Amino acid sequence: MEKKTIVLGVIGSDCHAVGNKILDHSFTNAGFNVVNIGVLSSQEDFINAAIETKADLICVSSLYGQGEIDCKGLREKCDEAGLKGIKLFVGGNIVVGKQNWPDVEQRFKAMGFDRVYPPGTSPETTIADMKEVLGVE
């Protein structure tokens, strides 16, 4: 089986690197080819990496609470760049303050994200979802 490629990074002005490294390690050990663009990454960084590596999925992390602002328009930019249909996952502390999670999840799905994860989601949960949406056993 050919490995599926995932672009992983921390979006916006967020410099939280530890969780990013944990996800990189977990996704790699699960059999994915991980292209980790690191922290302080723009939407364009994710898109360019996905184009260059022919990625199957983009996984966006955000821990500083501004993910909703940073992620707005990503699906449209992916489509415009020729990445129509690429899977988009987002997770972490993606909004400011305590908000009703189903509302947060709905807003991100309306922005075009395929999966939306709250703080504390295990890498195993994300891996299972990646395998499901990418058709990996």
From Swiss-Prot:
Adenosylcob(III)alamin binds at S13, D14, C15, H16, A17, S61, S62, L63, N93, I94, V95, V96, G97. GO terms for molecular function: cobalamin binding; metal ion binding; methylaspartate mutase activity. Its EC number is 5.4.99.1. InterPro entries: Cobalamin-bd, Cobalamin-bd_sf, GlmS. Keywords: Cobalamin, Cobalt, Isomerase, Metal-binding. Pathway: Amino-acid degradation; L-glutamate degradation via mesaconate pathway; acetate and pyruvate from L-glutamate: step 1/4. Residues 3-137 form the B12-binding domain. Coiled coil: none annotated. Pfam families: B12-binding. The keyword Isomerase applies. It catalyses: (2S,3S)-3-methyl-L-aspartate = L-glutamate. GO terms for biological process: anaerobic glutamate catabolic process; glutamate catabolic process via L-citramalate. SUPFAM superfamilies: Cobalamin (vitamin B12)-binding domain (SSF52242). It is an enzyme of class 5 (isomerase). Catalyzes the carbon skeleton rearrangement of L-glutamate to L-threo-3-methylaspartate ((2S,3S)-3-methylaspartate). Belongs to the methylaspartate mutase GlmS subunit family. Heterotetramer composed of 2 epsilon subunits (GlmE) and 2 sigma subunits (GlmS). GlmE exists as a homodimer and GlmS as a monomer. This is Glutamate mutase sigma subunit. It comes from Clostridium tetanomorphum.
